A protein has these predicted regions:
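Phosphate/NTP-binding elements of NTP-utilizing enzymes
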Residues: 1-204
Length: 204
């Protein structure tokens, strides 16, 4: 896509999704330092610290759909457990397969794997548990969503040793979403969004 934001809006219209003002910050961070020349479609790393009624899982699922409906894309949903990652995975499955009728080339609810063969190549979305870091090694990712990331044990290690390297080759994006929980690694990442280029953070 020439412009991710253009396609994103087309997709939101297609699925009849109208984000509220807080969700818009996740989908399209403010212009300026968060939209560098190397990444005109927005911040690569977004940290959203939001309450339980925000709809963060739903908005993250919309981001996943935007990516996985393009050819040759890889999306991971990483959470403290498979039970947690299943929530966003299920939202995506229900929208693409149940509501829109797209036919997956492979689907496993147990393994949380969903693949599509598009005209330009295969794309995949899968749910993963941070309890099993060995499962976070391998293919390059276009998008990684870290759900309830403040509750991921050893988040710093998981991010730096496993997830961040998977984003390098494709210049992939990461979205950290979580409810507030102390001043650990999630809070440190939140502060990066206030000070570092290509990072953006907000709370709601």
């Amino acid at each position: 896509m020439d412009n991710l934001q253009n396609y994103k809006q087309q997709w939101f219209d297609f699925v009849d999704y109208t984000p509220h003002s807080g969700q818009k910050l996740l989908h399209n961070p403010p212009t300026g330092e968060y939209h560098s020349d190397s990444n005109p479609d927005g911040a690569r790393f977004i940290v959203a610290c939001c309450g339980r009624r925000f709809g963060k899982s739903y908005s993250a699922a919309r981001e996943a759909e935007v990516v996985v409906t393009q050819a040759n894309k890889v999306v991971w949903i990483v959470a403290p457990s498979y039970n947690t990652s299943e929530k966003i995975f299920r939202i995506v499955y229900d929208e693409l397969v149940v509501q829109k009728g797209y036919k997956p080339s492979h689907y496993s609810h147990k393994e949380q794997i969903l693949k599509f063969n598009w005209a330009g190549g295969q794309s995949i979305i899968c749910g993963k548990s941070a309890e099993h870091p060995s499962g976070l090694i391998g293919e390059g990712c276009d998008l990684v969503i870290l759900d309830e990331s403040s509750k991921i044990p050893n988040l710093k290690r998981i991010w730096e040793m496993y997830i961040r390297p998977t984003l390098s080759d494709k210049k992939g994006r990461a979205i950290f979403i979580s409810t507030p929980d102390g001043y650990g690694t999630f809070y440190e990442l939140y502060l990066r969004g206030k000070t570092q280029k290509n990072w953006y953070s907000f709370n709601s």
